[in-house]
């Protein structure tokens, strides 16, 4: 029999083992679609970003007008920009749902896959932040000023780090140039980390909604899940194009229609919606260093999740108390997102503080306690 190049060629063999003949649990649900959706998001962002970079000028005097020029004079420049800006939102929607799936179904017990995933999240957050600064609108400038300034809370070396990051004594031309360089570079780092993430995943194979070993019941990835993934792509790209074509500025900040001006501060400085939960946690602590530590902890706490798993069952499928707690956490994050968009005044301050406390309480104390309680209930 003639050798099949798909199974013998060194490169095709890797693709075959990852995307075609990959043994996949037969019962994985639509929640397992988000990994491939994140891959499509990354590809879309790199392609649209590359096209935007060809028309962008990383200079404080020209950045704003170069973006306006792209939208007005470049063929379909407006569409490319709208897809890129809103694509970031969809990227974060997918990654948050992907992490939520991991939490609910105990996928974090694949520690290497989980940890590389968190590093991917942090890299994505950094990429989105530096990218937001590039159009050089008011909120871009002041967002960059406020967030980079947080590093000055680090004792002794903080101020030096900030001035080193800025390339001067304030956010200016050197800052914009290096942010553009970073924004161009980081997506390729994300692509590399994704391959590591997948390598670790394929060491163990996918988890499934029951959280049990599924070696006895696996099916090939293609055609079953490749087809299911294509359906997922369509279901994501349709709302993305709808948003980009009908209301591209829905999720943006109106302040960014004003060119950056270091002399006037916007009334409410706030980041894009996908960072609002962390921003609310930052603001809920009246001390600068305390706020920065809470902000860092709000994301880095994910590294602790595998060690806080006390249940005998992997997933929450048959754990109703943990399910209730999980959805409480989701509601809590939505409240934090809303609070982050509100001005710092009563009653928003106290709501934000309570929601921040509840966030850490659920993850650090209530999840492990509930797991232990459910183990006890199983024995009776």
From Swiss-Prot:
Keyword hit for Transmembrane helix: yes
InterPro entries registered for this protein in UniProt: Cyt_b/b6_C (IPR005798), Cyt_b/b6_C_sf (IPR036150), Cyt_b/b6_N (IPR005797), Cytb/b6-like_sf (IPR027387), Cytochrome_b (IPR030689), Cytochrome_b_C_euk/bac (IPR048260), Cytochrome_b_N_euk/bac (IPR048259), Di-haem_cyt_TM (IPR016174)
Cross-referenced PROSITE patterns: CYTB_CTER (PS51003), CYTB_NTER (PS51002)
Disulfide bond sites: none
Transmembrane segments: 34-54, 78-99, 114-134, 179-199, 227-247, 289-309, 321-341, 348-368
Cofactor: binding comment: Binds 2 heme b groups non-covalently.
Domain of life of the native organism: Eukaryota
Protein's UniProt name: Cytochrome b
Binding site for a ubiquinone: 202
One GO CC annotation: respiratory chain complex III
Binding site for heme b b562: 84, 183
Mode of membrane association: Multi-pass membrane protein
Keywords of this entry: Electron transport, Heme, Iron, Membrane, Metal-binding, Mitochondrion, Mitochondrion inner membrane, Respiratory chain, Transmembrane, Transmembrane helix, Transport, Ubiquinone
Residues where heme b b566 binds: 98, 197
Keyword Glycoprotein in annotation: no
Pfam families named among the record's database cross-references: Cytochrom_B_C, Cytochrome_B
Remaining remarks: Heme 1 (or BL or b562) is low-potential and absorbs at about 562 nm, and heme 2 (or BH or b566) is high-potential and absorbs at about 566 nm.
Family: Belongs to the cytochrome b family.
Cell compartments where the protein resides: Mitochondrion inner membrane
Cofactors that this protein relies on: heme b
Record CDD domains: cytochrome_b_C, Cytochrome_b_N
Swiss-Prot/TrEMBL GO biological process terms: mitochondrial electron transport, ubiquinol to cytochrome c
Assembly and oligomerization: The cytochrome bc1 complex contains 11 subunits: 3 respiratory subunits (MT-CYB, CYC1 and UQCRFS1), 2 core proteins (UQCRC1 and UQCRC2) and 6 low-molecular weight proteins (UQCRH/QCR6, UQCRB/QCR7, UQCRQ/QCR8, UQCR10/QCR9, UQCR11/QCR10 and a cleavage product of UQCRFS1). This cytochrome bc1 complex then forms a dimer.
Role according to the record: Component of the ubiquinol-cytochrome c reductase complex (complex III or cytochrome b-c1 complex) that is part of the mitochondrial respiratory chain. The b-c1 complex mediates electron transfer from ubiquinol to cytochrome c. Contributes to the generation of a proton gradient across the mitochondrial membrane that is then used for ATP synthesis.
């Amino acid at each position: 029999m003639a050798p099949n190049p798909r199974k013998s060629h060194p490169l095709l063999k890797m693709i075959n083992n990852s995307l075609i003949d990959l043994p996949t649990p037969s019962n994985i649900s639509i929640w397992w679609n988000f990994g491939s959706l994140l891959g499509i998001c990354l590809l879309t962002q790199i392609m649209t970003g590359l096209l935007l970079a060809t028309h962008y000028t990383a200079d404080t005097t020209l950045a704003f007008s170069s973006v306006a020029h792209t939208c007005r004079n470049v063929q379909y420049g407006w569409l490319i920009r709208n897809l890129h800006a809103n694509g970031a939102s969809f990227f974060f929607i997918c990654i948050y749902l992907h992490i939520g799936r991991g939490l609910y179904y105990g996928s974090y017990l694949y520690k290497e896959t989980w940890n590389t995933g968190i590093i991917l999240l942090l890299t994505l957050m950094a990429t989105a932040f530096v990218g937001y600064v590039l159009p050089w609108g008011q909120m871009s400038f002041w967002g960059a000023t406020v967030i980079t300034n947080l590093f000055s809370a680090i004792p002794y070396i903080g101020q030096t780090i900030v001035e080193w990051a800025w390339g001067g004594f304030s956010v200016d031309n050197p800052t914009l140039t290096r942010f553009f360089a970073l924004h161009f570079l980081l997506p390729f780092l994300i692509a590399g980390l994704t391959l590591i993430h997948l390598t670790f995943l394929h060491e163990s194979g996918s988890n499934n909604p029951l959280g049990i070993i599924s070696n006895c019941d696996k099916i090939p990835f293609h055609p079953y899940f490749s087809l299911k993934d294509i359906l997922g792509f369509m279901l994501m790209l349709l709302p993305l194009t709808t948003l980009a074509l009908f209301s591209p500025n829905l999720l943006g900040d109106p302040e960014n229609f004003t060119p950056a001006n270091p002399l006037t501060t916007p009334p409410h400085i706030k980041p894009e919606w996908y960072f609002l939960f962390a921003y609310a946690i930052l603001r809920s602590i009246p001390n600068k260093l305390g706020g920065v530590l809470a902000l860092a902890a709000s994301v880095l706490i994910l590294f602790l999740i595998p060690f806080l798993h006390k249940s005998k069952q992997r997933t929450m499928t048959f754990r109703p108390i943990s399910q209730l707690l999980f959805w409480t956490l989701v509601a809590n994050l939505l409240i934090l997102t809303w609070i982050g968009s509100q001005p710092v005044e009563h009653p928003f301050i106290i709501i934000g503080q309570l929601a921040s406390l509840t966030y850490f309480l659920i993850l650090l104390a209530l999840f492990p306690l509930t797991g232990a309680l459910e183990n006890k209930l199983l024995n009776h």
